[in-house]
Design a protein with these regions (language model features):
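Domain-scale signature associated with acetyltransferase and cell-envelope carbohydrate enzymes
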Residues: 1-161
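PRPP/pyrophosphate-binding module of the type I phosphoribosyltransferase fold
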Residues: 164
Length: 164
């Protein structure tokens, strides 16, 4: 079942030059992502530190969108929803809860959105952050041992027609 378009980029390096070649390809339903009709994903990356246990979709992109950027799901509960006719220019989205972006939204290059503080405000809880991350990386699963229970988080909602 075809659900959208994605641009793949190949970079060729010649001494003194860097040439980016973009190729339009089709995106099939995979990795818990639903993409609406006529949307283009360019320089698009999804990182799931922990996949949803029930395998349900966690990212929804509406129709007629142009989306670039990196989307990081730090735990199994995060969901990102993007409305129709939305542009995201190379941003970073880090989600443990919920990020909702309305329709007809324009987000400029280099914006970062986090629905969490990434680290607890309590020093006693942060003491293990580095060792927990290192342990997960050594096992090939970054974030596996991160304790999100004491990290403050709240949903982000960008309403229709916002411009950032």
């Amino acid at each position: 079942m075809l659900i959208g378009n994605i641009f793949n980029k190949m970079r060729i390096k010649i001494p003194g030059f860097i040439i980016d070649i973009h190729r339009l390809s089709k995106l099939e339903k995979s990795d818990n992502i639903i993409v609406g009709n006529n949307s283009i994903l360019s320089d698009f990356k999804v990182i799931e530190r922990k996949k949803k246990a029930d395998g349900t979709n966690r990212m929804f992109i509406g129709s007629d969108c142009l989306i670039s950027g990196k989307f990081v799901f730090e735990n199994e509960n995060g969901t990102i929803k993007i409305g129709n006719s939305t542009f995201i220019g190379g941003g970073m989205f880090i989600c443990i809860d919920n990020i909702t972006i309305g329709s007809n939204v324009l987000i400029s290059w280099g914006c970062t959105f986090m629905d969490n503080d990434a680290h607890s405000l309590l020093a006693s809880v942060r003491l293990n952050d580095v060792s927990d991350w290192k342990r997960g990386i050594e096992e090939g699963n970054p974030g596996k041992y991160k304790n999100w229970e004491k990290v403050a988080h709240a949903p982000i909602i960008l309403k229709d027609n916002a411009w950032i």
